[in-house]
Amino acid sequence: MTAFETESESAAVPVDAAAYREAMSRLASAVHLITTDGPGGRAGFTASAVCSVSDAPPTLLVCINRASSAYAALTQNGTLCVNTLGEGHETVASLFGGRTPVDERFAAGTWRRLPSGAPALTDALVSFDCRIVGRHAVGSHDVLYCAVEAVAASGQADALLYSERRYRTLPRAPRSGSAPAEPARAARALGARPAEGPALALRSA
């Protein structure tokens, strides 16, 4: 048997779901609140499975588990807002990521209504007002294709990331001519121990 045949046979073995989830936990991802409001009701959830599809026309991809409490409202309303989170949003991210009642989730932030009717977090790094234009079922999830109809960038915080089941922060890149981030701050962003002082306690979602 050749090496090529051995590799092909190995690749045909199904990947264990737990092993796949563990591997995916090592990917650092931006953290977003996906929110909606309309005839189907108000709802929202925390997501990291968000990415750009195209800039012409501007389109985002959002994945949602069909077992999510937000699924019915989101698909019935047909609109949503992608709110990208920054440092300081760990609490609201955890609330939207658990089994917290809807009213308590939205009570944790300050919101404004977008033209689509979706709620936008006022201090999000950026909010994308979207209309769902396509949907495709894959396994337990639906992949939503979302046409971006408006963008609002307002927050100035460092980016919030999720990696190894913990929230972490990524400092904003310094502007041209400005000093780089101090070592202690850079260490906190990486979840490492700063040169001086205690290590930052990173909370799991």
UniProtKB/Swiss-Prot annotation:
Reactions performed catalytically: FMNH2 + NAD(+) = FMN + NADH + 2 H(+)
What family does the Swiss-Prot or TrEMBL record give for this protein? Belongs to the non-flavoprotein flavin reductase family. RutF subfamily.
What is the protein named? FMN reductase (NADH) RutF
| GO molecular function terms attached to this record | FMN binding; FMN reductase (NADH) activity; FMN reductase [NAD(P)H] activity; riboflavin reductase (NADPH) activity
- What GO biological process terms are annotated to this protein in UniProt? nitrogen utilization; uracil catabolic process
Q: Which UniProt keywords apply?
A: Flavoprotein, FMN, NAD, Oxidoreductase
Native species of this protein?
Methylorubrum extorquens (strain DSM 6343 / CIP 106787 / DM4)
Gene of this entry: rutF
Function of this protein?
Answer: Catalyzes the reduction of FMN to FMNH2 which is used to reduce pyrimidine by RutA via the Rut pathway.
What are its E.C. numbers? 1.5.1.42
SMART domains linked to this entry: Flavin_Reduct
**Pfam name, any one:** Flavin_Reduct
Q: Does the keyword NAD apply?
A: yes
State the residue spans of region: Disordered.
171-205
Q: Entry's HAMAP family?
A: RutF (MF_00833)
Q: How would you classify this enzyme at the top EC level? A: oxidoreductase
